[in-house]
Curated annotation (Swiss-Prot):
The lineage of its organism: Bacteria, Bacillati, Chloroflexota, Dehalococcoidia, Dehalococcoidales. Keywords: ATP synthesis, Cell membrane, CF(1), Hydrogen ion transport, Ion transport, Membrane, Transport. Its main location: membrane. It is found in: Cell membrane. This is ATP synthase gamma chain.
């Protein structure tokens, strides 16, 4: 009987866990839809401003750097903007982006400092004892553009002051509900796009291209950071929904297995009791 009580208690415990994971799955699904809409809505603007900036940076220059954010210099120190969730329970997403950043840091032959978004990233950078320039946590599930400006400002100030010579950004790109890819890209200096020979850029700049570039470049960095954070949030909620769905399915499967074990144990217990009764009756006869 004691064994039956233990099994029954475990079934009840797993059933309660299944209720929790099911609720978390539904919450994540709701947040995922909103995060996907925000992330996908910003993609066209992000892609177009990237195209314009890259085209401007590719224009012939008269020996003078058009903007400090375009300056290329010998790389003595690198910064990486590492974007992760604040919370776990989202499958392998956190491990994948941390592994991407960790591998990148190990491969560098120069000093690397990290600007970290998300508590999971902060914990990781501290665990590997890497220099951390700044940390930003608790941005929430729906940060707006203004919430991310301090992150962009740290990066741009350090680059323009010469504290760092190159900036990379690591985040999780949303592909679909089931697929989220860890991505690592160069953010600064801006890499000019290579156009095929003879291709017309098809842009007429008013005022002159240098003025447009000076105005757009800071916005480009800010938008790139903001868009990467939105992509990471959409990926996080998608991964969490899938993880909680798998946890719920596993819990249901475990409940079925435990119920089968419970029924077999109960049947065995009843059979033993009947045998004891029959044996006792036979002894009295």
């Amino acid at each position: 009987m004691a064994n039956l009580r233990i099994i029954k208690r475990r079934i009840r415990s797993v059933r309660n866990i299944a209720k929790i994971t099911r609720a978390m799955e539904m919450i994540a699904a709701s947040k995922m839809k909103k995060a996907q809409e925000r992330g996908l809505a910003g993609r066209p603007y992000s892609e177009k401003i990237t195209e314009v900036i890259a085209a401007l940076a590719a224009l012939p220059q008269s020996g003078e750097i058009l903007h400090p954010l375009l300056e290329r210099r010998p790389v003595k120190k690198i910064a990486i903007l590492h974007i992760t969730p604040d919370r776990g329970q989202c499958g392998g997403l956190v491990a994948n982006i941390n592994r991407k950043t960790g591998t990148f840091i190990m491969e560098q032959k120069v000093s690397v400092s990290a600007v970290v978004v998300g508590r999971k990233g902060v914990d990781f950078i501290r665990r590997i004892r890497q220099q951390m320039r700044a940390e930003f946590i608790n941005l929430g599930d729906k940060p707006d553009y203004l919430d991310t400006l301090p992150i962009s400002r740290v990066i741009m100030d350090d680059f323009m002051s010469g504290e760092i010579d190159q900036v990379f950004i690591a985040y999780t790109q949303f592909v679909s509900t089931a697929i989220q890819n860890p991505v690592l890209e160069q953010l600064l200096p801006v890499v000019p796009v290579e156009f095929p020979p003879g291709q017309n850029l098809e842009y007429i700049y008013e005022p002159e291209s240098a003025a447009v570039l000076n105005s757009l470049l800071p916005r480009f960095v800010e938008m790139s950071v903001y868009h990467a954070i939105l992509e990471s949030i959409a990926s996080e909620q998608s991964a969490r929904m899938v993880a909680m769905r798998n946890a719920t399915d596993n819990a249901k499967e475990l409940i079925g297995e435990l119920t089968l074990v419970y029924n077999k144990a109960r049947q065995e217990s009843i059979t033993n009791e009947l045998l004891d009764i029959v044996g006792g009756a036979a002894a009295l006869a």
